[in-house]
Amino acid sequence: MNPRPKLRSPPPSSVVISPGSPPKSLINKMPRKFTRSTLTLATTLFSILALYAFLNTFIFSDPPNNVSSVSFSRNYNTQNLKSVKVYMYDLPRKFTYGVIESYALARGGEKQSDDSLLKYPGNQHSAEWYLFSDLNRPSLERVGSAVTRVMNPEEADLFYVPFFSSLSLVANPIRSNNAVVAPVERPAYSDEETQESLIEWLEQQEYWKRNNGWDHVFICQDPNALYKVVDKVKNGVLLVSDFGRLARNQASLVKDVILPYSHRINTYTGDIGVENRNSLLFFMGNRYRKEGGKIRDLLFQLLEKEEDVIIKHGAQSRESRREARKGMHTSKFCLHPAGDTPSACRLFDAIVSLCVPVIISDHIELPFEDIVDYRKIAIFVDSNTAVKPGFLVKKLRKVSMERVLEYQRELKKVKHYYEYEDPNGTVKEIWRQVSLKLPLVRLMINRDKRLVKREFTEPDCSCLCSNQTGILTTL
């Protein structure tokens, strides 16, 4: 905050007007008629200012203190700014409900004659289903959203491609090395073929060709989703969990949107407090991961003998989720180390559990950072420091109970941003983030039409950072 400006005395030549009446010297030097007009004007201006002050104080005053200024500002902007028009492609069935059906059939399910009977399986990458469902809702149920669905593509600012890319990736069950597999020539479902088929379909669409895909939005929340064709859709706005598997010329914070995982732990419904949180630190997950996730094994070695720390190896299962829910709801801090990629569902499980996240992931990107200050809800520790013997638990034990409560208060304020089923939660915020990309999309469309493409020997970020392309002559 800037210091209050010092009061300055008027210069010697100034006329000081005392309250009550105009100075005599000024009256003597002016015609009486002019002086009366001046006083009338001054009275009118004073009345206008007084009315403005009244309205500003009592009618247009700031929201009450118990209303979050961030939420107020966000809701005000959402309701008052012109919404972005989005056209959702009516994709062939195999890219939407067909993926759900293939997933179910591969697990012993039966074909359904009615798509409404198909149920999208709950998983950490289910954002694709929530966004698809949201755009299919009646417009009256989407009041306040930053985007409006239009049925005429000519009216659209952006085009949403609702391919269930993350579910497609796992439509065929992953079998262990010891599993006995029936001798078949090929799987019934091929994610790679489905990806390529999507591109073939898109390349036939007028609106895809019109702007080279810049105004298209794709969801690929699983780090490996769309891996086969990502170079063909990289111009578009990508909705991703992180950039762990994407090259620098494929994705960036400038162009794309970071999504939260759909949490798998039930939301903590109690109030803030530490009375029932007897454990210092909790973690449950796969101990052995690749790449940046190798730090997990080191953390296991350091922490598994600490008496007030619960750290367990566990795979995905209902029983594991029940155990994780109990652990997160009864611990003060929840560990979030990197996995195969920088992000993981565990962070969002911790947030809705009001368990203060301890993030040890050097390259993590976080969703909604324009409205959420993660320093207020989480503790960050770099990997090299975290693996120093005794450092982590010593640091956490020094955190006062009042400080833990402060973290919990902030977590409670923002946790709705990570609830996909909340009408004012994740889905609404994702669309707001997408709408903010529109000015850049328009810039890139216009820029793209005047430039000559050049071939580079290695990936670059010229599309985002600088003009490393040639100029197209327009004369």
Residue spans of the language-model regions?
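Juxtamembrane luminal stem/stalk of type II transmembrane Golgi/ER carbohydrate-processing enzymes
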Residues: 2-287, 291-318, 324, 329, ...
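Catalytic binding pocket for nucleotide-activated donors in carbohydrate/polymer assembly enzymes
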Residues: 323-418
